Amino acid sequence: LRAHAPGAHPRMTDWRLGTSSWSEPAWVGPFYPPGTPAGLFLPLYAARYRAVEADVTYYRLPSERLVRGWREKLPEDFRLCAKFPRSVVHGGSGASPDPGRILDHPEALADAQRFIAAMAELGGRAGPLLLQFPY
C-alpha cells in the first residue's frame, strides 16, 4: 500500500501490504506470468508488493545462505516478515505441542538463536519476526 497523496497522514507511508507467502505454484497464470519458474517468484512478487511473510521458516530453520538469497532478490524498501520455527514455538517437531519445551528449553533457545542469526542476513529488509503458538 503506497500513500503518496499530498496531505496524506505521514504514518500512512509506513504501511505495507503483503501476503503470507510468495511461493504458491497456483499463482502462476493469475499472478505470475505463465511459465514463471519458482526462482523468479520472489523478485516478481517484490515488484508489486512491499512486504511478505516467509511462512516456510515455521516448518524448517532457514540457513543464513538461504536468507541472503532472499535479500539479494528484494528491493531496499521491502520488508520480509518470518515466523519463528515450529521447534521454538511448538516445543519440537512432534505432532503434539510440548508445553515444557516451548521457548524455555535449551534446544528451543538454540534454534531461536540460529533463526535470529539467519534472519539478520536480511539487514534493513527484515520485517517483524512472528511467534505462532499452537494454542
What is each of the regions a protein language model found here?
Residues 2-4, 8-135:
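Residues lining hydrophobic/aromatic ligand-binding pockets adjacent to catalytic sites
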